[in-house]
Amino acid sequence: LLTISKIVSDNMRDDPTFFILQASRRLESRSLARLGSTVNGLLPKRAVVLNAFTLMLSGNTTSLGEYLRSLPPKQLSDRTLARLGDMAVAIQDSDSAAHLLENRQTTNVALSRSQARHSWYLGNMQDAVELLETVVPNTNRQLRHYRSELDVFQGRMPILNHGESNRRHTGGSIPTTALHFLTNSLPHTGSGYAQRSHSIMTSLGDQGWSLEVLTRAGYPLSIGKFRARAVDVIDGVAYRRVLPWKYQSDMGAKVQQQAGALAEAVRRLNPGVLHTTTDFTNALAVMTVAEAFNIPWVYEVRGQLADTWASTRPESAKTSQRYKLFKEREAFVAAHATHVLTLGEAMKAELIEQGIPDAKISIAPNAIGDDYLEEPIPRSRARGMLGLSMEHQYIGTVSSLVAYEGLDLLLEAAAELIPANPALRVLIVGSGVEANNLQDLSRKLGISEYCVFPGRVPREEARTYHCALDIFVVPRRNLSVTRAVTPLKPVEALACEVPVVAADLPALRELVVDGETGVLVAPESPHLLAEALRMLLGNSSKRASMGAAGRRQMLAERTWAANARKLSETYKVLADKLQ
């Protein structure tokens, strides 16, 4: 209870608007969206903040942004601007935040704090700290948060005392225990990240490794899972939660707590290898413990998270202090890891550009789990299970609904196709910050009755949705992050004998063989996407041959068992070198 109270209290004192928005999103309540829309319609026009707040709760961030940009800042009080600016930053709408907050000189504390939040959001970390220092005391939660995070980005490391270190392996045998440190995990998070982690570990278990996991400090309480247990055992893998009695929410203190928890686990387990994943804050704790105990460690680079961060911001974010430091810290931990693991050739090339030796890097691509090794569910049966008609053609995706996935382009392409193909349906499975915006766009395009949005589904049901599709679509936007990172869901679609139409980006070329397992189209062109879809929708034999070829390729090249065999050998070589 103390940890829960600390998490809620710190978030409310730091950025209450963002915390309320995140909490409302986790509810995933349609009634909440309806309530926001209803209340917004009843409020008088002068109730500016309440109008904006109900739009925010409804999840329609596009409409909220339009509303905020329509307001005249000079006619609004400092306090009102502060509240509206906080909403703009919370929904990641920098244009609206700039419209409201820039060029307003003030000594008002609330408005200055909002301006600092916008500066921080843009990556101007030192500027945000200096602005806060002029208006709030050193004890202010927001200021302490920013200072601590800036310290970590600038090089602060956790420190272990002598009692927590200097353990070395003894004897001639190589310990066959691997300790993993993760950002999140099953059963509380069902993301591709969590599924990949679990697949790697269960497959390593089949190779004779004992696996145990620690998750980041405060998780899963920090995502609202207040009834979580201290340990979850899933398929023989123990997921232990780091839930300290005195939880620290500042980044530096949190990394320190994580290092202490890892040191404790090392003394208990005597592991042969430590393994963690992006981002670098995970690696700082693992690196500190690995060096103190003389244990090899693997850094698994699953994304270029500085680019992911920049993808939701103006182009100027790539010249910001945060972006520069983020890149530097990621390169620093990768350079210090005993071994680096990544998802594909595009990401390996980026690591080599950062100065990581080729010989130090190996690839474990996103792969298919045991359920996808089974024969795909026949399409008619899958649709019957889901209540979908065999009279329709379904195009769509199973994905996190975020902006860089480019699903608005899919809807625009569908709007071009539907007049000539009224049997066409768009199936978008998943949840995320763009969910309400996509539904709103489908209404604006006049195709809402042709679109199905089931929301987030259990991972075992995702396979059924894959099998129900005629074509799986990956219309990702052309960004640094999408050029480098290979997603998991298209791999699963191909394993289900579903052809894939995808944006022609380097990472997606590693998955889709153009003309054989799917079609690659120039990114960010709804018309070209529509043309590729039209061609495949009109050729059932081509869809069938592409689907069969895709499944053969996935079974031959992308299984977790094959990944685990290679990773197990890597673990053994690393541990053997340090005996």
Set out the residue ranges of the language-model regions.
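N-terminal subdomain of nucleotide-sugar transferases
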Residues: 1-53, 59, 139-232, 237
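Conserved donor-binding/catalytic core segment of Leloir-type glycosyltransferases
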Residues: 178-180, 389-414
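A short, well-ordered alpha-helix in the C-terminal region of glycosyltransferases
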Residues: 384, 423, 528, 535, ...
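Short hydrophobic beta-strand element within catalytic cores of glycosyltransferases
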Residues: 474, 492-495, 499-502
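Conserved acidic donor-binding segment of nucleotide-sugar-dependent glycosyltransferases
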Residues: 514-515, 519-526, 535-541
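Carbohydrate-associated surface elements
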Residues: 217, 346, 367
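A short helix/loop element that forms part of the nucleotide-sugar donor recognition site in Leloir-type
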Residues: 164-166, 374-388
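Nucleotide-activated donor-binding/catalytic signature segment of Leloir-type glycosyltransferases, i.e.
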Residues: 437-461
